[in-house]
Amino acid sequence: MFLDIDACLENREPYYKMIENIAAECFMPLCYGGGVKNVEQMKKIYALGVEKIAISSQAVINRNLIKEAASLFGNQSVIVTIGIKKDVWGKKKVYINNGKKNAKLNLIDFIKEVEFLGAGEIVINSCDNDRVMKGYDIDLL
């Protein structure tokens, strides 16, 4: 899985040439995520040799994107990445925009919804453990 987390932060298109170069050298199924906001971008990325696309913030903002992508490309090609942070009381909350904005969603309900909409895989990411070298959030799992 190749995630360009800066694409979301910088509100820019994916770097298609970079994706093409990585896909050309990758001899295993490749998943790309970062800055993907619509099916037109997905079509370009799949055409470059990527097998799966991960969406995160857009899965919250535009849930229809999950359904549309699954319908066009197949459930196996759509991955939803869910960012999780604990609040001051230790409750797990869904966050978007690289862990900067609380989406105000119930985690379990959202997981069920994205599965129903057609996500073939769901990746849970503990934003609290990003870049701190503490390993997996076992309690979250």
Where would I find each of the regions flagged by the language model?
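Glycine-rich, proline-tolerant flexible connector loops at the mouths of alpha/beta enzymes
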Residues: 1-18, 57, 123-135
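Intrinsic disorder and flexible coil segments
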Residues: 5, 18-21, 29, 58, ...
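Alpha-helix-loop-beta-strand connector modules within alpha/beta enzyme cores
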Residues: 10-31, 67-83, 134-141
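Short secondary-structure boundary/capping elements
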Residues: 10-14, 34-37, 61, 102-106, ...
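Generic internal hydrophobic packing segments that stabilize the cores of diverse globular domains
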Residues: 16-19, 23, 39-47, 63-66
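Catalytic cores of alpha/beta
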Residues: 26-53, 139-141
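Conserved anion-binding
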Residues: 46, 50-124, 128-129
